């Protein structure tokens, strides 16, 4: 059946099969019963026999009346001339009337346009239409060639320089756009008759008279001042700095205050052109602006609020079920051009003062000072000048706490969830204390505002003293949440607070240099987590290193330092999360190589002396050289050059596989090569010829039972003295970002040692051995028998980290072999390994509920038990769902976070299982509870459980209904792909709706398309892989740059190849046909026979 392509009939078949399980088949059948019309029901069918018709009666012929002679109508010449003149007069009158009405209509349109209409400005120079062949595709523009703009094309001309912005904005609820008016003061550096600004998704007026150029005139108004001591606030114009209080003693005098006014220059705008690709708007003037002059540009506009960069509206429902909105700037790269027309490039930075018109009762929180006045039915808030304005408008209230260093932390939330911020305040307080201790530095500001926005999508920008986070990453409910939510809050807050010390990326061109802006907060968040929740950072890194290594072993991986990034399309291709996590792992490897004390000393020196240096990362490596003082030697026995060491890890993709090969009884050789999951997919051309030819400077972290000398680094292959009786281990405690391979015999010896005395190796070393041996077996470098033998000792393992790695590997095996003939054998094998550990953790749930890593292990074991023993798992989960959720919540009218009695760490699985095996009534109950829930974490759990339902039609509606929230729809798609029915729906829905829904809605947002494709597409076989490849060919323009699609194809290629190569080998092992590790005497006898 796998090779049969059912096309659209396949989707209908899925609908019919799964809908029956929910009692919905009747609806489907009723739709197919189309009643006959009354006429069709009464008339007999033509094929039925009929009686012969009666014979016709003879017709009686009637006599025809005599034909009358025709009358001729005559017209005199005079009458004809009169008729002709009347016709001419009618034509002239009709022409005059048409002209008059057209003129009136045109003048009315001009009047409306001048006063209220705003239209998208396009290039008025239109190309002539040419004949084009009909394209047999859904979108004709898919055939257009893909051309990325160059750096020079994207750059703004330097003949005009902004001094300041004064912008008024009036956001409208419901995605109706933001009406705005911008005043921009400009210095003219070179003579020009054009002004070029950045603009994206902004509409301009056609009434060019509304766009004005003025001169700023400063007048002085007199003001009386009494003698005495006066306090004033001074702010240098255009500086963007905070006001500085000054005190002076004066006598009674008259002081003067400068007041600015604007006088029209008489220069007119004759044309306005918009270039969508370059994100520029060009104003053409009727006169040339002179060098050295200063003008103020006034331009009205309307900006969108529905995109994912710039100003965005987030909708939610309050506790009474009323829909409300919050508006917030979306802090990402080059975002000002989405809010108002601006010179949105690093070389043209200028402070902006923002005036916001908003509804009465709402609050404005910003990264600068805010003054609000009441205008009756509305309010006006004015933001002080700042380089990168960042703000939130909404119904907000604050909770606050003061740190020991005197910083006031305020967390702003909706009024109905204010009580759930106590935990976040405490974690923010501890995070600042932890950062101040690690960095030996304090924040420059004495206040920090953290705003919680429902459904917010976290960006990469950092605003001083101002943080915006998703509400679900802030709120904690003691009754409904668990250790996972505590960890989620602590990590997110620690990450964003750490970023306050290091700044953020404000311009695409900086990304190549500023990779550390992602990595440093990631690294420090784990350090802070150890202080806040007592989570061992080394254990956590060992577990989380798995995803980093798996991703980096693919052909679609990316280097940490990405250069030549100029546009938003380039940025969309960058995997920010991966770069941040791998970068943090590299920083940890540096820490383990140089020592904690030296590392902290270097970081502190960087914060105090080099943080503002450019290039940014050069300052950090100088700090390390200073802290090391030439004491640590590198691979060449010279003082370690930290910059060169790190460059080998950040300028090329992937990581090394260090191989240990025994040459004879007294010598081993160490060598390195790039490790890949397989070699079926090629890297992007620009990454194939790596800068260092896939050679790294590798810290070995070596442990040996015999003398091997002072060995710390691997650069080129070299040999070590090692006797046969001695053992050697590399990358102990999982400190390095690489894998290690030993000879097959050595792996078998390791398996025996683990069975005999696994405690002699640290738990992180044991975890790294399990991870490496399975990665090597999956890649074909080792037999799978060798990897499975290493797990023989697992029933005796008591530590958490090795089990975390093993359960993750077992789960991946079950996913790859789902539906395969050996699935039952594999399930029995895994059950024998895990059932004792599962019973052990289940018997003491209190420990798992308070320890994050043990809680993760419990979750992994529950997932595995649901696969290998589904009947036992489902019965228990269903019982919890009925008794702990439906019974107390279904008719109570309460919020789920208040009425649910299901333990917090089990809610995700219990809710999903209950919805999956429930009926339509259960689905609607959970949907209604999710809709009115005010607790962010509980709302997520309820919404995601809806994706477990088994009615395909309901799942499709669920995706469509949640497209306005990228974070929600991606979570739903991931959850669907974890269930058998949802997996059949998600990928097909994306393909079917790419042109009609997704591409249109997210036309200028490739990052969101990338996230949706990554979450929603799962490819399990050749047919599905071929389907996506064909889809990408037909939509090559809109899928260009969606790197998650290439990643999915590579993953599918790897899995398909793996199944072809490994199923027989695994079958033989599970059947007991393999002997296991060979003994020394057996190997010697086999060699003699050869």
UniProtKB/Swiss-Prot annotation:
It comes from the Eukaryota. SUPFAM superfamilies: Leukotriene A4 hydrolase N-terminal domain, Metalloproteases ('zincins'), catalytic domain. Residues 21-33, 241-257 have a biased composition (Low complexity). Residues 1-77 are cytoplasmic. GO terms for cellular component: cytoplasm; extracellular space; membrane. GO terms for biological process: peptide catabolic process; proteolysis. Gene3D superfamilies: 1.25.50.20, 2.60.40.1910, Neutral Protease Domain 2, tricorn interacting facor f3 domain. This is Aminopeptidase-like protein AC3.5. It is found in: Membrane. Residues 59-71 have a biased composition (Basic residues). Residues 99-1090 are lumenal. It is a single-pass type II membrane protein. Residues 21-71, 217-259, 1069-1090 are annotated as: Disordered. Residues 1081-1090 have a biased composition (Acidic residues). Belongs to the peptidase M1 family. Glycans are attached at residues 115, 123, 143, 176, 230, 402, 710, 723, 789, 894, 919, 964, 993. Keywords: Glycoprotein, Membrane, Signal-anchor, Transmembrane, Transmembrane helix. The chain crosses the membrane at residues 78-98. Residues 1069-1080 have a biased composition (Basic and acidic residues).
């Amino acid at each position: 059946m796998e090779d049969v392509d059912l096309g659209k009939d396949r989707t209908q078949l899925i609908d019919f099969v799964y809908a029956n399980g929910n009692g919905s088949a009747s609806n489907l059948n009723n739709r197919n019963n189309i009643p006959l019309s009354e006429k069709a029901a009464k008339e007999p069918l033509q094929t039925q026999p009929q009686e012969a018709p009666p014979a016709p009666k003879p017709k009686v012929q009637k006599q025809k009346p005599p034909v009358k002679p025709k009358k001729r109508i005559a017209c005199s010449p005079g009458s004809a001339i009169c008729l002709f003149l009347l016709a001419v007069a009618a034509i002239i009158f009709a022409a005059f009337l048409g002209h008059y009405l057209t003129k009136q209509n045109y003048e009315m349109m001009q009047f409306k346009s001048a006063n209220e209409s705003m239209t998208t400005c396009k290039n008025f120079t239109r190309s002539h239409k040419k004949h084009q062949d009909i394209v047999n595709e859904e979108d004709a523009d898919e055939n257009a060639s893909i051309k990325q703009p160059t750096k020079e094309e994207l750059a703004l001309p330097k003949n005009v320089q902004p001094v300041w912005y004064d912008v008024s904005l009036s956001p409208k609820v419901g995605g109706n756009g933001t009406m705005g008016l911008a005043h921009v003061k400009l210095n003219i550096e070179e003579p020009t008759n054009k002004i070029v600004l950045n603009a994206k998704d902004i509409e301009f007026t056609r009434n060019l008279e509304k766009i004005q150029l003025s001169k700023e005139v400063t007048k002085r108004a007199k003001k009386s001042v009494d003698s005495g001591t006066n306090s004033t606030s001074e702010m240098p114009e255009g500086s963007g700095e905070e006001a500085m209080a000054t005190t002076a003693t004066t006598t009674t005098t008259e002081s003067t205050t400068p007041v600015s006014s604007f006088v029209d220059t008489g220069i007119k705008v004759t044309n306005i052109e918009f270039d969508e690709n370059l994100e520029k708007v060009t104003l053409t003037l009727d006169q040339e602006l002179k060098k050295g002059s200063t003008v103020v540009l006034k331009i009205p506009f309307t900006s969108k609020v529905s995109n994912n960069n710039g100003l965005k509206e987030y909708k939610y429902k309050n506790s009474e079920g009323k829909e409300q909105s919050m508006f917030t700037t979306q802090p990402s790269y080059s975002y000002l051009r989405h809010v108002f027309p601006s010179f949105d490039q690093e070389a043209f930075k200028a402070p902006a003062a923002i005036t916001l018109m908003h509804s009465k009762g709402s609050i404005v929180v910003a990264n600068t000072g805010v003054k609000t006045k009441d205008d009756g039915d509305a309010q006006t808030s004015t933001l002080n000048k700042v380089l990168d304005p960042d703000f939130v408008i909404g119904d907000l209230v604050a909770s606050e706490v003061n740190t020991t260093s005197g910083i006031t932390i305020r967390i702003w939330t909706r009024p109905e969830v204010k009580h759930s911020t106590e935990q976040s305040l405490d974690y923010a307080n501890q995070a600042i204390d932890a950062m101040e201790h690690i960095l030996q530095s304090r924040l420059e500001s004495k206040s920090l505002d953290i705003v919680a926005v429902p459904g917010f999508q976290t960006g990469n920008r950092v605003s001083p003293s101002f943080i915006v986070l998703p509400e679900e990453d802030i709120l904690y409910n003691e009754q409904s949440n668990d250790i996972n939510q505590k960890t989620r809050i602590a990590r997110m807050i620690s990450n964003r607070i750490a970023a306050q010390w290091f700044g953020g990326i404000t311009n695409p061109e900086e990304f190549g240099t500023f990779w550390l802006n992602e990595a440093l907060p990631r690294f420090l968040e784990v350090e802070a987590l150890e202080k806040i929740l007592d989570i061992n950072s080394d254990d956590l890194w060992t577990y989380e290193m798995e995803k980093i290594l798996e991703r980096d072993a693919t052909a679609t991986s990316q280097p940490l330092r990405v250069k030549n990034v100029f546009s938003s399309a380039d940025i969309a291709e960058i995997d920010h999360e991966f770069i941040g996590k791998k970068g943090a792992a590299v920083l940890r490897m540096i820490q383990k190589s140089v020592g904690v004390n030296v590392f902290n000393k270097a970081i502190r020196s960087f914060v105090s002396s080099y943080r503002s240096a450019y290039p940014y990362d050069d300052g950090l490596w100088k700090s390390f050289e200073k802290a090391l003082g030439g004491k640590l030697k590198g691979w060449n026995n010279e003082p370690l050059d930290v910059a060169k060491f790190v460059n080998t890890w950040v300028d090329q993709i992937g990581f090394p596989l260090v191989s240990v090969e025994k040459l004879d009884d007294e010598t081993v050789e160490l060598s390195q090569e790039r490790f890949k999951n397989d070699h079926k997919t090629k890297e992007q051309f620009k990454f194939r010829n790596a800068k260092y030819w896939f050679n790294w400077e590798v810290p070995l972290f070596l442990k040996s039972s015999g003398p091997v000398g002072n060995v710390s680094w691997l650069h080129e292959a070299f040999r070590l003295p090692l006797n046969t009786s001695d053992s050697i281990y590399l990358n102990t405690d999982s400190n390095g970002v690489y894998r290690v391979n030993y000879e097959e015999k050595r792996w078998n010896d390791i398996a025996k040692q683990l069975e005999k005395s696994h405690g002699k190796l640290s738990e992180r070393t044991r975890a790294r051995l399990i991870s490496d041996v399975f990665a090597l077996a999956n890649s074909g470098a080792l037999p799978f028998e060798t990897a499975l033998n290493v797990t023989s000792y697992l029933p005796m393992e008591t530590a958490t980290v090795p089990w975390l790695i093993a359960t993750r590997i077992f789960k991946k095996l079950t996913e790859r072999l789902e539906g395969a003939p050996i699935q039952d054998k594999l399930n029995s094998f895994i059950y024998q390994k895990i059932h004792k550990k599962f019973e052990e953790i289940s018997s003491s749930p209190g420990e798992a509920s308070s320890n994050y890593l043990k809680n993760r292990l419990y979750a992994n074991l529950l997932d595995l038990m649901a696969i290998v023993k589904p009947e036992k798992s489902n019965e228990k989960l269903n019982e919890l769902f009925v008794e702990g959720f439906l019974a107390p919540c279904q008719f109570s009218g309460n919020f789920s976070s208040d009425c649910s009695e299901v333990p917090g760490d089990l809610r995700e699985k219990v809710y999903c299982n209950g919805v999956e095996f429930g009926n339509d009534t259960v689905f609607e109950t959970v949907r209604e509870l999710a809709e009115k829930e005010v607790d962010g974490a509980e709302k997520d759990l309820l919404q995601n459980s809806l994706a477990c339902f088994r009615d395909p039609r309901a799942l499709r509606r669920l995706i469509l209904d949640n497209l306005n929230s990228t974070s929600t729809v991606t979570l739903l798609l991931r959850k669907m792909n974890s269930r058998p029915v949802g997996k059949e729906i998600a990928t097909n829905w994306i393909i079917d709706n790419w042109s009609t829904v997704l591409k249109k809605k997210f036309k200028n947002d490739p990052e969101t398309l990338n996230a949706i494709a990554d979450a929603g597409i799962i490819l399990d076989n050749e047919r599905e892989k071929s389907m996506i490849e064909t889809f990408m060919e037909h939509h090559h323009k809109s899928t260009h740059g969606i790197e998650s699609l290439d990643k999915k194809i590579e993953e599918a290629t790897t899995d398909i190849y793996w199944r072809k190569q490994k199923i027989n080998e695994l079958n033989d092992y599970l059947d007991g046909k393999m002997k296991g590790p060979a003994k020394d005497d057996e190997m010697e006898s086999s060699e003699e026979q050869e």
